[in-house]
């Protein structure tokens, strides 16, 4: 864990300016993976060169795929699924939950042996939700806690299609099963309890694969091949979220965000902001590769408390840390529930959000499935820690902009996982 400490101070004036947020992390991962599995050359622009997505590139290079990456441009020379070769060493996913879970789906259908590892945080995250259904499909997967924890050993091969009902909504699990189903005999169908982000389905379609959706059931026929496609990655709404919240709560602010992804399965934060009374406008909307994008402007707003629950949770699961910061600045009680999934992110985000914001004087309490925030009380300075979780780190930086006193943030290095230019962009608005 990066021990670097940064001293943060209250914003002296309103935030003002224009930011092009980095490429969407979810889409960047998938563009590289699908390009590596496809026949032909895939060109990716707008790629997020953060640590997580670079882990995906490294893993596929180890399986013999030629990938060139310079800044936000990536070229992948795919030779089809059969072009993937048995790796010589272990596949290290670093801190990336997306990489490991989707990779397990790919590896399950490949006729070779592989071992997947990650960092300490990955070593604590549950993998049985992916490995159990993949085993049902015929993959041989072993690991600590009977395949629940890394390192994981996968001996793939001919898998069979299944009909699987997911107990917990997870786009990563859904995607892993669809990628395994692509290689299986027959039609695999996955039913989710709540609709989750659908980047995998949209991008498979762009790569020439037929995926059908009926209600909350997604089906894929095995034996289809991917054809290379060029991918233009929109800006990541999860990264934009930090500046959307900052623009709302720092007095005298007006912030423009360009080229932000507006996929409805990810845009829950926009609905919450509108509901709460934010001065938010969205324009210049276009769609490329099945992914909508647009420009947005946010200014300081008088906001009302809000409730987040049920079907809305998967559409903003990664934005809850910064929405909790927003809630501390709104008079009244904000409630977040049905968000148990936060417990299995890079940290237990219920505990870390509540624990760290409480250190800054927030009136906030954890519940079994979320949190209750009684806002409107000024935040104070204090010592806080990202716990190696990029989204916690950035949320605490936004909190510091409103704190009456300096905030000392430990483990800032984690932020580079998804937003390497975060501090540079924040500085440009001040």
From Swiss-Prot:
<feature type="binding site">
    <location>
        <position position="26"/>
    </location>
    <ligand>
        <name>3-phosphoshikimate</name>
    </ligand>
</feature>
<feature type="binding site">
    <location>
        <position position="391"/>
    </location>
    <ligand>
        <name>phosphoenolpyruvate</name>
    </ligand>
</feature>
<dbReference type="GO" id="GO:0008652">
    <property type="term" value="P:amino acid biosynthetic process"/>
</dbReference>
<comment type="function">
    <text>Catalyzes the transfer of the enolpyruvyl moiety of phosphoenolpyruvate (PEP) to the 5-hydroxyl of shikimate-3-phosphate (S3P) to produce enolpyruvyl shikimate-3-phosphate and inorganic phosphate.</text>
</comment>
<dbReference type="GO" id="GO:0009423">
    <property type="term" value="P:chorismate biosynthetic process"/>
</dbReference>
<dbReference type="GO" id="GO:0009073">
    <property type="term" value="P:aromatic amino acid family biosynthetic process"/>
</dbReference>
<dbReference type="Pfam" id="PF00275">
    <property type="entry name" value="EPSP_synthase"/>
</dbReference>
<comment type="similarity">
    <text>Belongs to the EPSP synthase family.</text>
</comment>
<comment type="pathway">
    <text>Metabolic intermediate biosynthesis; chorismate biosynthesis; chorismate from D-erythrose 4-phosphate and phosphoenolpyruvate: step 6/7.</text>
</comment>
<dbReference type="InterPro" id="IPR006264">
    <property type="entry name" value="EPSP_synthase"/>
</dbReference>
<protein>
    <recommendedName>
        <fullName>3-phosphoshikimate 1-carboxyvinyltransferase</fullName>
        <ecNumber>2.5.1.19</ecNumber>
    </recommendedName>
</protein>
<feature type="binding site">
    <location>
        <position position="25"/>
    </location>
    <ligand>
        <name>3-phosphoshikimate</name>
    </ligand>
</feature>
<dbReference type="GO" id="GO:0003866">
    <property type="term" value="F:3-phosphoshikimate 1-carboxyvinyltransferase activity"/>
</dbReference>
<keyword id="KW-0057">Aromatic amino acid biosynthesis</keyword>
<feature type="binding site">
    <location>
        <position position="172"/>
    </location>
    <ligand>
        <name>phosphoenolpyruvate</name>
    </ligand>
</feature>
<feature type="binding site">
    <location>
        <position position="170"/>
    </location>
    <ligand>
        <name>3-phosphoshikimate</name>
    </ligand>
</feature>
<feature type="binding site">
    <location>
        <position position="25"/>
    </location>
    <ligand>
        <name>phosphoenolpyruvate</name>
    </ligand>
</feature>
<comment type="subunit">
    <text>Monomer.</text>
</comment>
<dbReference type="InterPro" id="IPR013792">
    <property type="entry name" value="RNA3'P_cycl/enolpyr_Trfase_a/b"/>
</dbReference>
<feature type="active site" description="Proton acceptor">
    <location>
        <position position="318"/>
    </location>
</feature>
<feature type="binding site">
    <location>
        <position position="172"/>
    </location>
    <ligand>
        <name>3-phosphoshikimate</name>
    </ligand>
</feature>
<feature type="binding site">
    <location>
        <position position="318"/>
    </location>
    <ligand>
        <name>3-phosphoshikimate</name>
    </ligand>
</feature>
<feature type="binding site">
    <location>
        <position position="345"/>
    </location>
    <ligand>
        <name>3-phosphoshikimate</name>
    </ligand>
</feature>
<keyword id="KW-0808">Transferase</keyword>
<feature type="binding site">
    <location>
        <position position="97"/>
    </location>
    <ligand>
        <name>phosphoenolpyruvate</name>
    </ligand>
</feature>
<dbReference type="InterPro" id="IPR023193">
    <property type="entry name" value="EPSP_synthase_CS"/>
</dbReference>
<feature type="binding site">
    <location>
        <position position="125"/>
    </location>
    <ligand>
        <name>phosphoenolpyruvate</name>
    </ligand>
</feature>
<keyword id="KW-0028">Amino-acid biosynthesis</keyword>
<feature type="binding site">
    <location>
        <position position="30"/>
    </location>
    <ligand>
        <name>3-phosphoshikimate</name>
    </ligand>
</feature>
<dbReference type="GO" id="GO:0005737">
    <property type="term" value="C:cytoplasm"/>
</dbReference>
<keyword id="KW-0963">Cytoplasm</keyword>
<dbReference type="InterPro" id="IPR036968">
    <property type="entry name" value="Enolpyruvate_Tfrase_sf"/>
</dbReference>
<dbReference type="InterPro" id="IPR001986">
    <property type="entry name" value="Enolpyruvate_Tfrase_dom"/>
</dbReference>
<feature type="binding site">
    <location>
        <position position="349"/>
    </location>
    <ligand>
        <name>phosphoenolpyruvate</name>
    </ligand>
</feature>
